[in-house]
Amino acid sequence: ILNKSTLNIFPKPWLLSTIQLASGVIWMAGMWTLKLQPVPKVSKKIIFSLAPVALFHTIAHVSACVSFSKMAVSFTHVIKAAEPVFSVILTSVFMNETFSAMTYVSLLPIVAGCSLAAMKEISFSIGGMNYALVSNLGSVLRNVFSKKLLNEFTYIDGTNMYALISIISLCYLAPVAYLIEG
């Protein structure tokens, strides 16, 4: 709701996404400076490994923000609620994992609920829906590949991994946001 309120006053979702990422990066820099969080040991290998994860993070973040700018927050969240469905499908494809029959059955209420809510939506926007779907896809791909990396780079905790992803994501997003919204 805060994103939507902000976008009503400042209708620049790409720049808002950039400001949000920059805020997180500044916060983590403060945490590292004050030694409240250990500074991660960063190498070229980890930066190159995190680059695709950060790209998916960027896509997920900015797509959600653009979706909020195009339609009701409630409908964006209805679409985002389908993320577990995306997660099961993409985890099966990329991680070669199989799930129990109960996992698939548990997705049925999600699909039914999202479908029912979508049918009742008054402020429908195909653009907003597409951005929300792209956000789901980006979030799930980020999570799938992050999971792989957490197993590979065990010396970096989840907080620092997320911070590094956010820094790279900010590097991706800032110039694009500037070009799109100035």
Label each residue range with its predicted role:
Residues I1-G182:
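Polytopic endomembrane small-metabolite transporters, centered on the Drug/Metabolite Transporter
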